[in-house]
Amino acid sequence: IYVLMICTGLTAYYTGRSIGRSRCAGAVTMVLYTMGHYHLEDVYTRFALGEVAAMVFIPLAFLAIYDLTEMGHSRKGLLCVSYSCLMLSHTISFVLCVVMGIIWMCARWKRIAACRRLIGAVCMEALACAVLTCYYWLPVLEQFADGMFYVSNEPAFYTHEETQTLLAIVSGRYSVAFIEIGILALMVFVSIYKKVYNKKALMCLVTAAVLLVCETKIFPWKLIDRTPFVSIQFPWRLNMFTEFFVALGLALQSVDIIKLLPSYRRNACLCAAGSILIGIFSLNMVWNIELGGYVNYPEGYADNTGSTDSIGFWEWLPAEGDLATSVGSENSGMVKCEDTYIRGRYGSDGSYEFDAGEAAGECIVPKYYYKGYEACSVSKSGATEYITVSKDAQTGLVKLDNIQKYSKVRVYYKNTIIQKTSKCISFCGAVLILMHAAYISIRKSKRRVKQHGEK
């Protein structure tokens, strides 16, 4: 968590400094984004490490698309790297960033269309991102093609049921601390009055306000629930972006206002100190208000499977599966061979072993079926035989055919052909990209040396 927090601060600082062209802007963006309410919620209340990891790369993803249209694509490869990291850390955040990128491209289409080189650059970086991450998304698509899952038929959450009220937004639950929006608006209004308002900061304010409104029922989330975007689950996830735009807007506007005042360095320090105070305010809200509802667990809570089973979302289980008849049943963890139940052993590598004893024929193993499972049995004579593995249509568990008496059976997961191939593709792609980056770097250094020699 500490490493992720530090990395979040570094990426936010780099983004704020690059867009604001000021170290002060970078510092303010870093503090406000890292100590933003929703970020602290993710760390201390929701313990959503995937989303916390994704928040490291959201500033870089925005900087990549901003650089593409506003800076002449000077940071080549940033789009590929940031979106690849988002894909591998938190898929939903990746999808939301793709939507953000599409909206940005549509808004700046004239500039992109005027420079066809940018279209080619986007396509090449998107292709590189797909190659680098195919070892993740190709196996996922393979599993979806092989069977149905709860996430397809019965999502755990519907977005229209998880919207925020305006009161909840103002109070700050799962939201940015509203004081940040207020300060940003005040700074923009003061700057407009002084006629030094920052257009980028104003756009950040408008974007943040729109995102907050989108968390309410005003946005047509019921229509979203009819599409695959139902996997967003919680509309208040948008606070990842709201917090970033608030932090960036405050940073950009602060720099412009500070320039009006004498003693730039002193006022820059005061600005950074003020942002830290806002961050401490957010931390206090999370610590004193939110955490209070999570520390008073009843005695024996962790030992009660009825309480803890729901922590692991079941939406990635096969659609035929039912926790009540597997994890929550009296015979949980046991192999069913007709009317006989056999206690087996789970291995540290995810495998499952059991001794068949008198049982023979068809058996149901307490492991949910996914494409790639294999099984083998060792008879008394020591002969090894591979067993046909399939999915039980009633429970979604692994089904084994033709178990022999007194054999030792082991069920384990083995990579499919697509998984092995996709890993090779990603590895080769990464090597080629690194070689290309090294070649570009060497060529640039030679060019600098040549130019220096000519001078």
Each language-model region and where it sits:
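Membrane-embedded transmembrane-helix bundle of lipid-linked glycan/lipid transferases
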Residues: I1-G293, K408-Y412, I418-K455
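Solvent-exposed, flexible loop/coil residues
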Residues: F47-A48, A53-F57, P228, W236-L238, ...
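Membrane-interface segments at or immediately adjacent to transmembrane helices
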Residues: L291-G350
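Active-site-proximal, structured, solvent-exposed surfaces of multi-pass membrane proteins
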Residues: S326-K455
